[in-house]
């Protein structure tokens, strides 16, 4: 089971996008930037540090959330220049979906 805290990113200045992370997520997983951003505007999300991929230069986080149209997404993110940078976005795995649904089963 994942260990996580409800981390707040409310003081950040939006998102950082470039050709690399925009096209990669759309081509590999059919997830566009607007869906990624929607996850952060929906209160049904879990954010936890990804200790496996964090290094001494940059913390990585995993986000399990839901888009406006109800798509359950898993994101890998980091913070650069006080902005959220999405590294990877895809549909939640079965294990991630079970964790997400158990957290929000009464909501």
Predicted feature descriptions by range:
Residues 1-107:
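Ribonuclease/tRNase effector modules and their secretory precursors
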């Amino acid at each position: 089971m994942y260990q996580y805290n409800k981390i707040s990113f409310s003081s950040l200045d939006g998102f950082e996008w470039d050709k690399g992370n925009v096209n990669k997520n759309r081509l590999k997983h059919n997830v566009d930037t607007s869906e990624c951003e929607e996850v952060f505007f929906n209160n049904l999300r879990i954010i936890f540090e990804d200790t496996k991929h964090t290094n001494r230069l940059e913390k990585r986080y995993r986000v399990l959330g839901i888009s406006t149209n109800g798509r359950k997404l898993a994101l890998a993110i980091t913070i650069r220049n006080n902005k959220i940078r999405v590294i990877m976005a895809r549909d939640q795995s079965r294990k991630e979906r079970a964790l997400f649904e158990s957290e929000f089963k009464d909501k």
